[in-house]
Amino acid sequence: MAFSPFGHPYGSTSQFLVSASSSATCCETAPRPVSDVASASTSASTLCCTPYDSRLLGSARPELGAALGIYGAPYAAAQSYPGYLTYGPEPPTLCGALNPQYEFKDAAGSFAPSLTQPGAYYPYETTLGQYQYDRYGGVELSSAGRRKNATRESTSALKAWLHEHRKNPYPTKGEKIMLAIITKMTLTQVSTWFANARRRLKKENKMTWAPKNKGGEERKADSGEDSLGCLNGDTKDATASQEARGLRLSDLEDLEEEEEEEEAEEEAAVSAARRLADFQKSTQPLPAPCAAAQERCLESRECGLGLPRFSFTEAPQSGEADFITAEPGGPTMILHYPSGHKPRIWSLAHTAAASAVESAPSTPPRAQSPECHMIPRQPSSIRRLLVPRDSEGEEDSPAAKAFGNSTFTLQGLPLNCAPYPRRREPEVRFQYPSGAEG
């Protein structure tokens, strides 16, 4: 016989429940069996229930009794075991509760409050009882399974090791593993503790040890005091003082090295900044007056340049008066404009003459570059050096046509230099042919 809606087949005999008496059976007829509820069959079937022993239901397996109490509801009251569903004398009550036409949410309120939460696992067999079927059954949720915090007792071994190795507080991998086993800590906790301890030790040394600017005499005095303390104290105190002195000196050496490195870096930065400033100064353009003075007067640092002075004088009637006598003792520069080809020498005097020609009321002629000849003049005699004129067939220059027989005189530029004595001002004269007509 089987109850298909529950999915648990049960025969006439069970391996868990044994009938107390084979003759005591309870069979009732039902107009509609459970298997034919959906098909609405009219054939009748018989539901037979066998009474079970009370010691098998209540004492041996209470879980099985709670699970199977649904099927033995008519006999649960006799065995002092409550049932989840109360059955009447007629089995159609059970069939009506399982009818698909019946709304299940209304019937759920009758047996849902009586359901209890099952345990983490069900040890159906003693050999399988030690295995945890639930994934949280074997996990210990207490603090014993978590990482242990570092306490004062657990860090005592770490402190002892650090005190023994103060000069080199860096444990190896094997020492870390050994300390982790002793203190029951992880390797990460041990490494973190040693890192924090080294930082605290360095901070304490900076605060309590001698400053890094101490001189040699003060160090000698400190070493003498330390030696006296070692002689007066016991052996343990002497060893501790020697270690402290060694640590202090080693730290002072390290600080001196760091100070030297910092000073070297500062000096390098200052020198780089200085070179950059010099480079910027050298790249700055010179002012216009200083640049002009540097170009025009290379022999002196302080130069004064006067303005040119122009004078137009009429030529005398005599033939020898084509030139104006310059001051005795000074050089004379005579400029002659040829009419043939373009001159090869450019000078400041020609530039001034060209500007004067352009400012004349007549048509401005094309500027021609003069050929300059320096004539030294002595007080007793006057020597003239002239450039021969071109052939007579050539036409006169435009400057000669413009000025005729006149002479254009340009007084020299006064050039005064501080380190040298002042020279006489030279006189620059321009000569134009007198035969040309305007």
From Swiss-Prot:
Q: Which SUPFAM superfamilies match?
A: Homeodomain-like
Q: In which tissues is it expressed?
A: Expressed in a subset of retinal ganglion cells and bipolar cells; including in type 2 and type 3a bipolar cells.
Q: Which GO terms describe its cellular component?
A: nucleus
Q: Which branch of life, at top level? A: Eukaryota
SMART domains xref list: HOX (SM00389), IRO (SM00548)
Q: Where is the composition biased (Basic and acidic residues)?
A: 214-223
Q: Does the keyword DNA-binding apply?
A: yes
Database matches in PROSITE patterns: HOMEOBOX_1, HOMEOBOX_2
User: What are the entry keywords?
Assistant: DNA-binding, Homeobox, Nucleus
In this chain, the stretch annotated as Disordered covers 205-270, 388-438
Please describe what this protein does: Transcription factor. Binds to the iroquois binding site (IBS) motif of target genes to regulate gene expression; functions as a transcriptional activator or repressor. Modulates expression of RCVRN, VSX1, BHLHE22/BHLHB5 and TACR3/Nk3r. Required downstream of retinal bipolar cell specification for the terminal differentiation of type 2, type 3a and possibly type 6 bipolar cells.
What is stated as this protein's family in its record? Answer: Belongs to the TALE/IRO homeobox family.
Can you name this protein? Answer: Iroquois-class homeodomain protein IRX-6
Instruction: Name the source organism.
Output: Mus musculus
